[in-house]
Swiss-Prot record:
Belongs to the complex I NDUFA3 subunit family. It is found in: Mitochondrion inner membrane. Residues 56-84 are annotated as: Disordered. The chain crosses the membrane at residues 19-39. One of its GO terms (molecular function) is NADH dehydrogenase (ubiquinone) activity. The keyword ATP-binding does not apply. Changing residue 62 to D: In a breast cancer sample; somatic mutation. This is NADH dehydrogenase [ubiquinone] 1 alpha subcomplex subunit 3. Accessory subunit of the mitochondrial membrane respiratory chain NADH dehydrogenase (Complex I), that is believed not to be involved in catalysis. Complex I functions in the transfer of electrons from NADH to the respiratory chain. The immediate electron acceptor for the enzyme is believed to be ubiquinone. Keywords: Acetylation, Electron transport, Membrane, Mitochondrion, Mitochondrion inner membrane, Respiratory chain, Transmembrane, Transmembrane helix, Transport. The modification N-acetylalanine is found at residue 2. PANTHER family: NADH DEHYDROGENASE [UBIQUINONE] 1 ALPHA SUBCOMPLEX SUBUNIT 3 (PTHR15221:SF0).
Length: 84
């Protein structure tokens, strides 16, 4: 089986080296990002960043889930990012 794959790759390289290189570069573009040390931090930042940003509303006192001010800290802290 490995001999057949090797023969196929040699034949492909002989006939269309540009396509082989483009497939290798595309494959590396898919495989390498999760191996990067920055991948861990980008995942942590994306988890801590709110998807929905607060909308200013007039608080009548009966809305416990609405912060009193739009800049009140809520959700996960980003202190770990400041300490890098």
């Amino acid at each position: 089986m490995a001999a057949r794959v090797g023969a196929f790759l040699k034949n492909a390289w002989d006939k269309e080296p540009v396509l082989v290189v483009s497939f290798v570069v595309g494959g590396l573009a898919v495989i390498l990002p999760p191996l990067s040390p920055y991948f861990k931090y980008s995942v942590m930042i994306n988890k801590a960043t709110p998807y929905n940003y607060p909308v200013p509303v007039r608080d009548d006192g009966n809305m416990p889930d609405v912060p009193s001010h739009p800049q009140d800290p809520q959700g996960p802290s980003l202190e770990w990012l400041k300490k890098l």
